[in-house]
Structures are given as C-alpha cells and as structure tokens.
Amino acid sequence: MCKIIAVANQKGGVGKTTTSVNLAASLAVTKNKVLLVDLDPQGNATTGSGVEKSNLDFSVYDLLVGSLTIQDVLITQTADYDLLPSNSDLVAAEVELLKGENREIRLRKAIAHIRDHYEFVLIDCPPSLNMLTINALVAADGVVIPMQCEYYALEGLSALMETIKAIKEELNPHLKIEGILRTMYDPRSKLTSEVNGQLFNYFGDAVYLSLIHI
C-alpha cells in the first residue's frame, strides 16, 4: 500500500529538499519503489536527483495546469527512484491554478493514477503556504516538517499547523503529522536549546528523537 508524504515548511532554508532527496534515496536503497515529486519552482530536488533542469521537455507544471499525463512527465532513469521534475515554469502554476477549477486537487488526481505502483511518494514542497503546497497537503497521507530550532521557528510552525488543520477539515480528513524533524541543530546555542524545549512542550511525541546536526 502506497504512503504519500509531503515534506513541508513555509520557511526556506530548513532542509526540506535535503530531507526529501535523502529520504527518497534511503527508501529506494531498502528496496522500496519510490516516487519523488519536486513541487518547488527552484527545482533543487530535481538537480539533487541528477537531472538537469534546463534540459527538461516537460515538468510538473505541465501536469498541474497542462493536458499531459503523469506518464508524460515522469522520469524513471535517474538515481534509484522515479521523479516528477520541476523547473522555473512552475512559478506560473500558482497564478494559473488560482483561475482553474478543482485547483486544490490537481496533484491528488494525477497521483491517483500511479500510486499503486509505489510504496512511497514523497513531495518536496515550496517554501510558502501557496496553492502548490495546498495541492501537496491535499494529496498526502502525512506530513514531515523539517525545522531549525531558531528565532520565530515556532511562529512559522504554528501557521503551517493551522493550514494543515483547515485542509483536514475541508479537503483531506485523513491527513496527519508524521513528525517534526529538527535540522541544522546546534547544541552549543542557548537559543537552540530554548526553542528545542518549547518544541517538545508544544508538540511532544510529534517531534522525532533523531535530529540533523549543523
């Protein structure tokens, strides 16, 4: 049975793409069939998967707002997992999705056609709570949230939690938090320790015990 996981945080530079690519590679190495969806216009997950963005004929943009099928866009000859690639064309998708019908469920409908072929689908989200991220959360079964223990981190995390709550109520009642992953963790920093303590106070068991050091 396929599990779809969105890797999301509206703050940039917290390790979303690094988490997505390494998780995809790790799951693939353990003989799981994995699809990585690059939903960030920066396309760093695409580059990190060994695909040159400038050479793409099609990207996930063509899947979300065009007439192409997922098979038209899918790249299977890369790394140890399959990829739905992204490039800067995806910037325009935000505006075009806002004008279209069924705008929140485009990705879910696309993935529905192929999800039985995979054990895991990982979605690398953009660093904002826009229509692309909403598409990811509507399509997902769970959310992994990478975050740094830094100033304003909890404020941003609270905004994401509110978005997840709204999507659960309106569009995807089965969505759940898989866990919060602390990244770029600096144990020498007093601020890091303070935010880390607050994180456990607010979210408890939702915080992964494993962490990524700076």
Identify the function of each model-found stretch:
Residues 1-212:
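P-loop NTP-binding core
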